[in-house]
Every structure is written in C-alpha cells, then in structure tokens.
Amino acid sequence: MLSIQQPLLVFSDLDGTLLDSHSYDWQPAAPWLSRLREANVPVILCSSKTSAEMLYLQKMLGLQGLPLIAENGAVIQLAEQWQDIDGFPRIISGISHGEISQVLNTLREKEHFKFTTFDDVDDATIAEWTGLSRSQAALTQLHEASVTLIWRDSDERMAQFTTRLHELGLQFMQGARFWHVLDASAGKDQAANWIIATYQQLSGKRPTTLGLGDGPNDAPLLEVMDYAVIVKGLNREGVHLHDEDPARVWRTQREGPEGWREGLDHFFSAH
C-alpha cells in the first residue's frame, strides 16, 4: 500500500518528466509538489543537468535544501542538514569534467570523430539550442564530472566512439536532447542508492521509493525504485525495464508534468 504518510522518497527526472520538454513548464505538477512538501516527503531531482542548473530549479520548485542528483549521477548535492557527511556539500564520483574534456579532444583530433560539446560554444549558442535564457544557459556549462555534446557523425562511428570511451573508463549516455560522457562507474542508480541508504541510516528505516522518468537514461534509476512511473516521452527508444510488473510500474498516457501528475494520481489512488 503506497501512502503519502509512510516514509517515502520521490526521485524525479526533469526535462520531459517534471518539466515540459519545450516550454519547461511544471505547473500541472504543482498541486502534487505542494502535497508532498506538506507531508514532508522529499522530492529528489535527478538529471543530466549541472548542479548549478538544478539548484536554481530546485529553488523555483520549492524543493531547496533537499539532496539532488546531477550529471546523470556523477554528482550528488547533499541535503543542507547533512553537513557532517564527508564531502559536503557535493560528492563527485570518478573522472572530472576537465579530464573527460581532454580525452574527448584527443579522440576528436586523432580519430576524427565529429561532435560539438557545450565547451566548444558560448552561452548564446546553448540558449538557442535549448530555449533557455542566456543566464540559465550559462549554468549548463558548469559541469564538474561530465561533458554534454551533440553527436554529428554516423551511427557506425558512434559505436566505435562508445567502444573507445569504454576502453578509457567512460560511458556514453543518451539524454532527452543531448549525449553525455561520464565516468563508467557513475550512474543515477548508484547515486539514488547512496541517498536511500543515507536516509535509512539517519531514520533507522528504509524509505519506500517512487521514481519518475521518461528517457533511456532514466532506466537505471527506475530499476532500483520500489515503484516507477514511465512518463510518455519524445525519445523513440523509450524506457524498458527488466521488471515491468504493473503493480510496480505505470506508463502514463500524458507527457511531461501532465504525465508526472498522472503517475502520482495512479499510485496514490490505486494502492
């Protein structure tokens, strides 16, 4: 029985899930965000975005002070009250942004792969790509443990590129709009498990978990959740989980924040 009163954590992707993919609107989800906040249920944002972007969005959504997962799990922003935890305020796993950038530049120069990273362009270009304001676009460039890029080569070359990255201890991950390179050991699932374990250690009881996402890069997160909402998305590959028991997994009919609301309506009324 899923109840808003029980110890509960909600993990949510942003673009295409809690935020509309085009307008970044989140208002359809606002009533549920208010209910969860009033019930002291943490909503933990989990995204490919930088921690700087996510802290801005966290404040806008009324979720400030809570932990969050940035850069597809390579960065964990700790909760404000977790100041005694080693690494406060952020835990960064694996290879740094600067080191990844060096690897990518070498691969591009020596093996002639075609791609454009966010480091190659200015904030005005990123604003044009994303529809963000220039000030928000500037926050997208503050990577700490990953690189975001647009792939401009063939599928065959992408397979070769992915293999080369794996050989170098890196992974190539598809997001809602862009591709991301990060340490092979990092992931939304590992970051979520760390946060769950921290809440369990602090409270003495493992919280029930509900995750929401819309893209292939959300699958690892949703796999480790007790309950999962797969929000109808734009990505042609979709999201496929090993365990799609309908008692555990709900696929929405609506997209973005409308689907986010639909998913919460389903689990809190159906259980």
Swiss-Prot record:
Binding site for Mg(2+): 13, 15, 214
Protein keywords: Cytoplasm, Hydrolase, Magnesium, Metal-binding
Gene Ontology, cellular component aspect: cytosol
GO molecular function terms noted in the UniProt entry: magnesium ion binding; mannosyl-3-phosphoglycerate phosphatase activity
Compartment(s) where it occurs, according to its Swiss-Prot or TrEMBL record: Cytoplasm
InterPro entries: HAD-like_sf, HAD-SF-IIB-MPGP, HAD-SF_hydro_IIB, HAD_sf, MPG_Pase
List of catalytic residues: 13
Reactions performed catalytically: 2-O-(alpha-D-mannosyl)-3-phosphoglycerate + H2O = (2R)-2-O-(alpha-D-mannosyl)-glycerate + phosphate
Record-linked NCBIfam families: HAD-SF-IIB, HAD-SF-IIB-MPGP, MPGP_rel, PRK03669.1
Name under which the protein is recorded: Mannosyl-3-phosphoglycerate phosphatase
